[in-house]
Every structure is written in C-alpha cells, then in structure tokens.
Amino acid sequence: MVLEKQLGNGCTWIDLDLDKLKKLEDLSEIYGLDKETIEYALDRNERAHMDYHRGNGTVTFIYNVLNLKKDKEYYEAFPMTFIVEHRRLITISNTKNAYVIEQMTRYLDSHDTLSIYKFLFASLEIISNAYYPVIEQMDKSKDEVNGLLRQRTTKKNLFALSDLETG
C-alpha cells in the first residue's frame, strides 16, 4: 500500500508499506530507488545510520523504531527507512512500525505547510519519544529490584536484575 501526502511548497511525502507492496521491483521502477537503498530497507538487522549520495543529493536515514508490543522478555527495535530527495520524502515502513506512520499523518494534518526536513526531524522525534516511557518503566523496575536485593540477595532477584539489563 502506498500513502502519498502533500507537505506544501510542492513537496510530497510517500510512505511505502513493505508488507502490502505486491512487487518489490516497484520500489526501483516506480519510485526510482536504487538497489542498495532497497536492500537497506529490507534488512531486518540493518543498523541505524545515515548515507548521503553526492551524485543525486539523496539522503538516506535508517532509524530504529521501538516495537511497542513486547513479544519476548525484552523490547525489540526495527529499522525504518527515510529517503530525502529534492522534492519528496519517502518512508519505507511495515506493520511493526505502522504506529509511527499514523503519528506522522496526524502531525502532518495538524500543520499547514512543512518543509521536508522539518517533517523528517519531527518524525524522528516521534520515534524517539516512544522510547521514553519504556526506559522510565525499566528504570523503575531496576530500582525496585535493586531495593529487593539490598534487603535480601536471592537468586530470583539476581535473575530479575539480569533480565532488566538485557531487556
């Protein structure tokens, strides 16, 4: 599925949902994305980074999005791709980070005109803000377990602390 919205000033935001696209070749043929960028977007283990392509002035951001559904004993993060071209911002998303697209859409709807970079950085802030409640909860849990360990050191409490450190 493709979402296309106007940012203003002739700029466009296009979101490509990888889970709903029928043919991945469309990313290259229709949207002009290079093979390397497509490979970044498809790689579940891609690390967060930024690339600048001097030839065409394209900037690619890979940013880690927190999966809000804790399926395991720990939280996972999944990469989301942002591509900034001359007059458009392309995001490549999936079901794990769809909540970000919804929040980006609400942000866009509440602002008349946005530059590509203002919208990009607002989007990155949306993603970063999702981490704060999780970090605060983990910090609170760590303090509780530390308090229990100070009262009485048990194997169970040591494992609980260990789980927090890896989670």
Language-model segments: residues:
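Peripheral, non-transmembrane regulatory/ligand-interaction domains of membrane transport proteins
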Residues: 1-167
